[in-house]
Amino acid sequence: NILMSIPNIPDENIPVGKDETENLFIKDYGKIISKKYIKSHDEIAENLNIIDFETAVKISGSRFVILKDSLAKLERALISFMLDVHTQENGYKEYSVPVIVNEDAMYGTGQLPKFREDQFQLNNNQWLIPTSEVSLTNMVSNSIIDYEKLPLRFVASTQCFRAEAGAAGKDTKGMIRQHQFTKVELVSIIQPEFRLNELDRMVGCAELILQKLDLPYRVML
């Protein structure tokens, strides 16, 4: 279907570049300590014996990980923290959604057909979600929503699944580009004329999390 292969039209303010090296710097927050003191996340976790790659490979294969003890607790705490901030301070409504969806849902959020090779397909023509955006967005698919009830703001924490077939040659060290991971996702259903304002608002919501954790970051375009 040719229509399914036509991408969304970028906003006219989006810069044109050959790849991420030509992204534009917008702003940053915080200070990064000297690189000579920085260790990778997997090195720190292995030294503390709170992560297990070998056992994960034994039971599931490559690109899986087992979190142990304080690291498993940290993951749970961060998920709860982010959900609380987004629901109590940022105005999002929390949902618990399915991680298995039908093919229409995958097409409806642009995962298919372009990213087919990066998805996990089940035998019954259902799919494991690569992000809870698929489930959250499709809650309103084929629906007519009263203009006055917008915006709708959804947040969910789910397991996400990605085959990462296109990740060959990219950074896959440690917990990067895993087949299974947990993610807190924000979705806004918004009036078209307010889309850019809502995008800025969502970026601000994400920034708030990093600021509360005192983590340095950059905003790029």
Label for each model-derived stretch:
Residues 28-221:
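TRNA-recognition modules of translation machinery and tRNA-sensing kinases, especially anticodon-binding
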